[in-house]
């Protein structure tokens, strides 16, 4: 398959571009459910004229249903998207990239979703869908699942369902609150996952960033001790990787720390660890 795609790129480069464009249109409409042409053109970064021409082709093939209310993918379109997914991953070069990352970091599996989740809500939605799909396959009976906060984990939570309710599973926050939107808090995401899967959940009502004295004081509370012990039993932990400076500002760190992170080349953050572009830890904050 990889060789066929390479040959096609050489002999029919225009065909490859057209295929990618129409796939992105169909995929975006499927994610949106029902969408207008102007809104879709804006989110895809193309003119309405170009989009109109492509929509006409997709409609004529029976892949789109167009009405006064907007556009939606037909049953035939959904089936086509499911069948073409592996081919498109090869076409975008994602399969090869997944394997390279898997080998480089010694991982069992890597899944890459096309698009820029920072710019496109459709890409963030697909990232959440992929995460929910993997989690469904990994969770076992009586598992404790720890989750952090953030927009990506919120998308995973909103799309997570089990084939049948599993009250034996428990979802818990893997960190405290960051003072962000309540929808993005770890507590909210844990409860959403539990409600959507028929599981249980526990909440942790403490801020993420604490001084040593405050931390030691909180750990004397029996209720806090109990939930922390449950969290430590988590077999699965799901976390996002945030922008270093954005996460530092959410923790309301002082300007000198922000400046130090910039000087150290901090690019990403997870669980209070700040990493440079090469993956080296350049700073640590207690969480």
Model region roles, listed by residue range:
Residues 23, 27, 125-133, 154, ...:
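Short, contiguous clusters of charged residues that form electrostatic/catalytic patches at enzyme active sites
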Residues 67-68, 143:
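Flexible, glycine/charged-enriched surface loops at secondary-structure junctions
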Residues 31-36:
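Short capping segments at the starts of secondary-structure elements
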Residues 73-76, 84, 88-209:
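N-terminal active-site beta-alpha-beta segment that forms phosphate/nucleotide-binding
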Residues 8-11, 25-27, 49, 70, ...:
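Short hydrophobic/aromatic-rich motifs at helix boundaries and adjacent loops
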Residues 2-24, 37-38, 45-50, 56-65, ...:
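Conserved phosphate- and dinucleotide-binding cores of soluble alpha/beta proteins
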């Amino acid at each position: 398959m990889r060789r066929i795609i390479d040959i096609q790129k050489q002999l029919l480069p225009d065909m490859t571009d057209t295929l990618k464009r129409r796939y992105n249109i169909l995929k975006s409409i499927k994610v949106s459910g029902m969408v207008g042409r102007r809104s879709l053109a804006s989110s895809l970064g193309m003119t309405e004229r170009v989009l109109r021409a492509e929509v006409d082709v997709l409609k004529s093939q029976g892949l789109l249903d167009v009405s006064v209310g907007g556009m939606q993918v037909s049953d035939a379109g959904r089936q086509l998207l499911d069948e073409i997914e592996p081919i498109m991953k090869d076409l975008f070069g994602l399969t090869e990239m997944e394997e390279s990352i898997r080998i480089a970091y010694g991982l069992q599996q890597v899944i890459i979703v096309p698009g820029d989740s920072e710019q496109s809500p459709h890409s963030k939605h697909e990232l959440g869908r992929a995460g929910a799909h993997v989690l469904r396959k990994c969770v076992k009976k009586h598992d404790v699942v720890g989750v952090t906060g953030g927009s990506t984990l919120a998308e995973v939570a909103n799309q997570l369902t089990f084939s049948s309710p599993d009250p034996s599973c428990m979802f818990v926050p893997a960190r405290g609150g960051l003072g962000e939107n309540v929808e993005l808090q770890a507590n909210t995401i844990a409860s959403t996952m539990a409600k959507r899967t028929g599981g249980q959940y526990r909440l942790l009502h403490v801020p993420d960033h604490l001084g040593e004295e405050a931390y030691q004081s909180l750990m004397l509370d029996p209720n806090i001790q109990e939930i922390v012990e449950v969290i430590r039993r988590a077999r699965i932990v799901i976390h996002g990787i945030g922008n270093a400076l954005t996460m530092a500002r959410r923790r309301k760190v002082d300007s000198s720390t922000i400046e130090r992170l910039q000087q150290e080349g901090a690019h990403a953050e997870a669980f209070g660890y700040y990493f440079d572009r090469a993956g080296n830890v350049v700073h640590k904050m207690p969480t």
